[in-house]
């Protein structure tokens, strides 16, 4: 991957892609639940 086209970005390289949506629909609730479960460990009964 040398810079043979220096002015041009890679063709399919937008920020919001189907892959971005698929990653974040899994990653955002996962991080949320990990933080929630970690916080539950410190709740005193």
Curated annotation (Swiss-Prot):
Keywords: Acetylation, Electron transport, Heme, Iron, Membrane, Metal-binding, Photosynthesis, Photosystem II, Thylakoid, Transmembrane, Transmembrane helix, Transport. GO terms for cellular component: photosystem II reaction center; plasma membrane-derived thylakoid membrane. It holds the Pfam family Cytochrom_B559. The modification N-acetylthreonine is found at residue 2. It comes from the Bacteria. With its partner (PsbE) binds heme. PSII binds additional chlorophylls, carotenoids and specific lipids. Residues 43-45 are lumenal. Its cofactor is heme b. InterPro entries: PSII_cyt_b559_bsu, PSII_cyt_b559_CS, PSII_cyt_b559_N. Its main location: membrane. Heme binds at residue 24. One of its GO terms (biological process) is photosynthetic electron transport chain. Heterodimer of an alpha subunit and a beta subunit. PSII is composed of 1 copy each of membrane proteins PsbA, PsbB, PsbC, PsbD, PsbE, PsbF, PsbH, PsbI, PsbJ, PsbK, PsbL, PsbM, PsbT, PsbX, PsbY, PsbZ, Psb30/Ycf12, peripheral proteins PsbO, CyanoQ (PsbQ), PsbU, PsbV and a large number of cofactors. It forms dimeric complexes. Part of a photosystem II (PSII) assembly intermediate complex PSII-I; crystallized from a strain deleted of psbJ, it forms monomeric PSII before addition of the oxygen evolving complex. PSII-I includes 3 assembly factors not found in mature PSII (Psb27, Psb28 and Psb34). This b-type cytochrome is tightly associated with the reaction center of photosystem II (PSII). PSII is a light-driven water:plastoquinone oxidoreductase that uses light energy to abstract electrons from H(2)O, generating O(2) and a proton gradient subsequently used for ATP formation. It consists of a core antenna complex that captures photons, and an electron transfer chain that converts photonic excitation into a charge separation. Belongs to the PsbE/PsbF family. This is Cytochrome b559 subunit beta.
């Amino acid at each position: 991957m040398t810079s043979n086209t220096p002015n041009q970005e890679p063709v399919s390289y937008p920020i919001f892609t189907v892959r971005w949506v698929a990653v974040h629909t899994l990653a955002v609730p996962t991080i949320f639940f990990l933080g929630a479960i970690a916080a539950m460990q410190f709740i005193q009964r």
